[in-house]
Swiss-Prot record:
Sorted UniProt keywords: Cell membrane, Ion transport, Manganese, Membrane, Transmembrane, Transmembrane helix, Transport
Protein name: Putative manganese efflux pump MntP
Cell location: Cell membrane
InterPro entries linked to this entry: Mntp/YtaF (IPR003810), Put_MntP (IPR022929)
TM region positions: 1-21, 41-61, 62-82, 105-127, 139-159, 163-183
The keyword Calcium is annotated on this UniProt entry: no
Family matches, as PANTHER family: MANGANESE EFFLUX PUMP MNTP-RELATED
General function of this protein: Probably functions as a manganese efflux pump.
Gene (name only): mntP
Domain of life: Archaea
Species name: Methanosarcina mazei (strain ATCC BAA-159 / DSM 3647 / Goe1 / Go1 / JCM 11833 / OCM 88)
Length: 186
């Protein structure tokens, strides 16, 4: 595969991570550059790791991925989005959220990288070498996640608490989109 093809694949896979990073950037107060770096490392790392797991697992997990992965991604994103909305409505009145703990980052990273696992499986079936695509996918996702978190912070800074509700709705909407695509509704 050419560099351009791998780069475009990385962009496509990074869109969910970008949206979730932007949503996270809107809600975390106080926001630090280290928060954006944490998001970028988790999302970039998982987007790079999952194709490798798919490539190694190949056909052994292909049925599971195609049948259940969209449901898992939907469940994780709906749960996290619902939690964000609940916290915005009933949580800390100062609106300070620290949703970037490691367990939350892990769940978000898994939810946004399940499609990369399927890409790894397709690489295995096609006999595609894995190293170059994985490096490019991970780097593109790292940069997009970092930029998404910073952009989210800039936007969220103006809207304060209401943005956490919007962030939760974005995560739920992303989960619904993943599920709708799987069910061929869109």
């Amino acid at each position: 595969m050419s560099f351009l093809t791998n780069f475009l694949l990385g962009l496509g896979l990074a869109m969910d991570a970008f949206a979730v990073s932007m949503s996270s950037g809107t809600t975390v107060r106080p926001f630090k550059v280290s928060d954006a770096l944490k998001l970028a490392v988790f999302f970039g790392g998982f987007q790079a790791l999952m194709p490798v797991l798919g490539w190694v697992g190949g056909s052994a997990v292909s049925g599971f991925v195609s049948d259940y992965a969209p449901w898992i991604a939907f469940g994780l994103l709906a749960f996290i989005g619902g939690k964000m909305i609940y916290e915005a409505l009933y949580g800390d009145p100062d609106g300070k959220v620290n949703s970037l703990n490691y367990s939350m980052l892990f769940l978000l990273a898994v939810a946004t990288s399940i499609d990369a696992l399927a890409v790894g499986i397709s690489f295995a079936f096609l006999g595609t070498p894995i190293l170059e695509p994985v490096i490019i996918i991970g780097c593109v996702t790292f940069v997009m996640s970092f930029c998404g978190a910073v952009l989210g912070y800039r936007i969220g800074h103006f809207f304060e608490n209401e943005v956490e509700i919007l962030g939760g709705l974005i995560l739920i909407g992303l989960g619904v989109k993943i599920l709708a695509e799987h069910m061929d509704w869109i």
